[in-house]
Amino acid sequence: MSGEGNLGKDHEEENEAPLPGFRFHPTDEELLGYYLRRKVENKTIKLELIKQIDIYKYDPWDLPRVSSVGEKEWYFFCMRGRKYRNSVRPNRVTGSGFWKATGIDKPVYSNLDCVGLKKSLVYYLGSAGKGTKTDWMMHEFRLPSTTKTDSPAQQAEVWTLCRIFKRVTSQRNPTILPPNRKPVITLTDTCSKTSSLDSDHTSHRTVDSMSHEPPLPQPQNPYWNQHIVGFNQPTYTGNDNNLLMSFWNGNGGDFIGDSASWDELRSVIDGNTKP
């Protein structure tokens, strides 16, 4: 007999607990048309999937560990109370903040019939007027009024079914520049002080990263150019015509090696070629 009693007790516990692999993802119509309606009509549900608690005595981050089921969404039955005795405004203040509605009640339909109302709320830390918005949200479901003669007190103190969840914030993607755009680069050219043609200054140039055109060619250092060219071509000063005439004799084509002009030119060439 004792074995049969234990077997029956184990069977009842299995019926009251969610089965392995069970996931609770009800729709708005199912929450209103089945779960909340059975709660209001005092009809029992064999599995306690939705607990009855006063959610306003908890902060939202404490509610997941109180819930019976749920991974990212948690459900609770809660009697909505009034903020003041003679007011229809509900009291949604918690220990650390308050719930604030984001709009009016939206009707929920099933087969063209309104089965209830849905309100969205956001949780704020702090007091009203100085609160900080959080990612915690709530969907509050309630049944529609049975008659048009319900008093404000009856409309305020009603059973609600609350869905608590944390909003997932999207992460911003990093800004990626197109292939034809380059980052901003600051170039610094320090001019040499050994040449009298150069001035003592530092020039800065910024390449615009948003420009589609290639950067303009950079001006070359005149001092650098004159020394590079000097190895390949001699630098002539004075009257070019007189210098050319001194290279030729009357017979044409032969250099005059013993002329004064040739001596001057030879000293210039020897000075450039010596290491």
Curated annotation (Swiss-Prot):
Domain of life here?
Eukaryota
Output this protein's name.
Answer: Transcription factor JUNGBRUNNEN 1
Please name the gene that encodes this protein: JUB1
Tell me which residues make up the NAC domain.
18-167
- Here the segments flagged for biased composition (Basic and acidic residues) are 198-211
Per the record, what is one GO cellular component? nucleus
Q: What happens when the gene is disrupted?
A: Precocious senescence and lowered abiotic stress tolerance.
Recorded hits in InterPro entries, A to Z, give: NAC-dom, NAC_dom_sf
Known tissue expression: Expressed in roots, root caps, cotyledons, tips and margin of young leaves, senescent regions of fully expanded leaves and floral tissues, including old sepals, petals, staments, mature anthers and pollen grains. Not detected in the abscission zone of open flowers, emerging lateral roots and root meristematic zones.
Function noted in UniProt:
Transcription factor that binds to the 5'- RRYGCCGT-3' consensus core sequence. Central longevity regulator. Negative regulator of leaf senescence. Modulates cellular H(2)O(2) levels and enhances tolerance to various abiotic stresses through the regulation of DREB2A.
